[in-house]
């Protein structure tokens, strides 16, 4: 095993052209900062020594007063063609908000005579994203987990395309838990689980609900109306859904299976509760103290 070389920030910098950087909105630039800091963190966890530079401090403080240029070859002498294959120039210079210059000079450039070589595969990596991806491939680490399905991902940048799998055709997305819906009505109804809002109240007992259908179902408990009956045991229910759920207990049928633990459930509520255990999601937050819970019953 080769000894792990000491790296600088420039060795792990993902590079963009000035035009690409200008086209990135605030969220994309934030994602870039997160990727850079995560790259550094993962390399340290793999045993690499990272020199802490001024640029890293800028990143940690959330500042964006610098730009990068794309890696390219600088060919000014045709006799040095073979040598230039090992020479890469990256512009890495601090700027001020008043700096609108688009020129790049040798004074503001960093020459890397040798690209990074992976100790496991021996592959030459000229881009920092390739460096980190290569190291994570050998280590087997997949540090990013999808909140929706629990799938582990190796690269932070790959989480964005993965999210689109879950949100495809669903243009209304919750900014708190990233759940997506096909229409704004369902999104507003979902947000009530975060805010605790319950606009539908029973006029008899004042119990409140997030949905009108839940209120109508509740009102039947006051009237005693139970139109759905189990033919095997004679048990009656307020809703047809409750009857169907009861009948599954006779059949021993468990339709909902967790792909993580293999545990099966006869009811979707039990399946959803089990799924939250794996993801660690706590979507129900107290408006007074901010404490969050995985189940709405714990919040109440």
UniProtKB/Swiss-Prot annotation:
Domain KRAB: 7-78
Gene Ontology CC annotations of this record: nucleus
InterPro entries: KRAB (IPR001909), KRAB_dom_sf (IPR036051), Znf_C2H2_sf (IPR036236), Znf_C2H2_type (IPR013087)
Residue ranges covered by zinc fingers (C2H2-type): 172-194, 200-222, 228-250, 256-278
Classification via Gene3D superfamilies: 6.10.140.140, Classic Zinc Finger (3.30.160.60)
SMART domains, A to Z: KRAB (SM00349), ZnF_C2H2 (SM00355)
Similarity-based family: Belongs to the krueppel C2H2-type zinc-finger protein family.
Biological role stated in the UniProt entry: May be involved in transcriptional regulation.
Protein name, entry field: Putative zinc finger protein 705G
Source species: Homo sapiens
Gene: ZNF705G
């Amino acid at each position: 095993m080769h000894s792990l070389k000491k790296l600088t920030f420039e060795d792990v910098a993902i590079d963009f052209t000035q035009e690409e950087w200008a086209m990135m909105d605030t969220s994309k630039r934030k994602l870039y900062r997160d990727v850079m800091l995560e790259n550094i963190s993962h390399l340290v966890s793999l045993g690499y020594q990272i020199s802490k530079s001024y640029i890293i401090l800028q990143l940690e403080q959330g500042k964006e007063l610098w730009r990068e240029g794309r890696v390219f070859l600088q060919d000014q002498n045709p006799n040095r063609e073979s040598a230039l294959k090992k020479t890469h120039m990256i512009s890495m210079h601090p700027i001020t908000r008043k700096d609108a210059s688009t020129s790049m000079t040798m004074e503001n450039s960093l020459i890397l005579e040798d690209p990074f070589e992976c100790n496991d595969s021996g592959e030459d990596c000229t881009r920092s994203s390739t460096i980190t991806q290569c190291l994570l491939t050998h280590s087997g680490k997949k540090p990013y987990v999808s909140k929706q399905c629990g799938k582990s991902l190796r690269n932070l940048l790959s989480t964005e395309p993965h999210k689109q799998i879950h949100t495809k055709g669903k243009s209304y997305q919750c900014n708190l838990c990233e759940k997506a819906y096909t229409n704004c009505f369902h999104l507003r109804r979902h947000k009530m689980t975060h805010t605790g809002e319950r606009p539908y109240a029973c006029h008899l007992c004042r119990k409140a609900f997030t949905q009108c259908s839940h209120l109508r179902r509740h009102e039947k408990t006051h009237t005693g109306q139970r139109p759905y009956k189990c033919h095997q045991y004679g048990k009656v229910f307020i809703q047809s859904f409750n009857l169907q759920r009861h009948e599954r207990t006779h059949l021993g049928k468990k339709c909902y299976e967790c792909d993580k633990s293999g545990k099966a459930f006869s009811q979707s509520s039990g399946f959803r509760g089990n799924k939250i255990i794996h993801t660690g999601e706590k979507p129900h937050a107290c408006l007074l103290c901010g404490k969050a819970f995985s189940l709405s019953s714990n919040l109440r």
